[in-house]
Amino acid sequence: MGEPQGSMRILVTGGSGLVGKAIQKVVADGAGLPGEDWVFVSSKDADLTDAAQTRALLEKVRPTHVIHLAAMVGGLFRNIKYNLDFWRKNVHINDNVLHSAFEVGARKVVSCLSTCIFPDKTTYPIDETMIHNGPPHSSNFGYSYVKRMIDVQNRAYFQQYGCTFTAVIPTNVFGPHDNFNIEDGHVLPGLIHKVHLAKSSGSALTVWGTGKPRRQFIYSLDLAQLFIWVLREYNEVEPIILSVGEDDEVSIKEAAEAVVEAMDFHGEVTFDTTKSDGQFKKTASNSKLRTYLPDFRFTPFKQAVKETCAWFTDNYEQARK
């Protein structure tokens, strides 16, 4: 059984980020139901590292449900540099949000994890049972461990108080409103920004690394639909991986080619192999998702890349970069 419909007041933390904006769009485009009141907040509304501010926000909104997206995030190179900062800031945010949600009587919290939480040394495909089987990749251990702790905390809230606090594990998310910063962003938005600059200046495109690592990319608007389904229908405390299938994994080289094609770039493409590749692959199984939603249709990768590139070009001045 899903949540009884109606009488849902849903607070979305991190509402101005990539996934928050996607949920906002999907809700506005008709996915919201009568009786659902959606409240999207960002760091402008409260500093979630501060317990008193977080509690005041939750007291004010009085949500029945929370989608917790707020986090200090960054790409591979920023993670390598600031493992402690990622750990400390996020541990405060997560504890403040989860405990304030508990204190105001929220019926359900859905938090957002990441596939980087999985053990570095593992078998593939990875699934939801493997989260705590070994240490994560050393490059971003601070962020990885702090995200794992949400799963630990969810289980503890359930054991001690019977709370339905759960989490989703998306693979590599991309789409409109992403962070397109070349130094600090994730791989795909970074590539989009680089291609835009190379095209504008007539220079070559340099892709960091060998281009060989493989990733499962999920379009933010697809993820938004799945988040809403989890909020209404998924009642396990165990996390669920939200991902395209294993066969839809693409190499960084293929991702770069999709961006080059979408942006009609005709310059030279080179790979800077002095830059780190990070994990070679982190192939995730979406079989648990498919047992619940066998017919869910993901946006084809090239179409999603095309839409994201078009959004970035149209919103270049305002885009995070």
Curated annotation (Swiss-Prot):
Role played: Catalyzes the two-step NADP-dependent conversion of GDP-4-dehydro-6-deoxy-D-mannose to GDP-fucose, involving an epimerase and a reductase reaction.
Name of the top EC class for this enzyme: oxidoreductase
Residues the record marks as site: Lowers pKa of active site Tyr: K147
Entry similarity comment: Belongs to the NAD(P)-dependent epimerase/dehydratase family. Fucose synthase subfamily.
Subunit relationships: Homodimer.
Reaction catalysed by this enzyme: GDP-beta-L-fucose + NADP(+) = GDP-4-dehydro-alpha-D-rhamnose + NADPH + H(+)
Annotated positions for site Important for catalytic activity: S114, C116
Protein name (Swiss-Prot/TrEMBL): GDP-L-fucose synthase
Highest taxon of source: Eukaryota
Residues noted as binding substrate in the record, renumbered to the chain: K194, W208, R215, D277
Lineage: Eukaryota, Metazoa, Chordata, Craniata, Vertebrata
GO molecular function: GDP-L-fucose synthase activity; isomerase activity
Assigned EC number: 1.1.1.271
GO process annotations (BP): 'de novo' GDP-L-fucose biosynthetic process; positive regulation of endothelial cell migration; positive regulation of endothelial cell-matrix adhesion via fibronectin
Active site residues of this protein: Y143 (proton donor/acceptor)
Keyword terms: Isomerase, Multifunctional enzyme, NADP, Oxidoreductase
Pathway the protein takes part in: Nucleotide-sugar biosynthesis; GDP-L-fucose biosynthesis via de novo pathway; GDP-L-fucose from GDP-alpha-D-mannose: step 2/2
Pfam families: Epimerase
Keyword Nucleotide-binding belongs to the record: no
Family annotation (PANTHER family): GDP-L-FUCOSE SYNTHASE
Species whose genome carries this gene: Pongo abelii (Sumatran orangutan)
Annotated residues for binding of NADP(+): G14, G15, S16, G17, L18, V19, G20, K147, P170, T171, N172, V173, H186
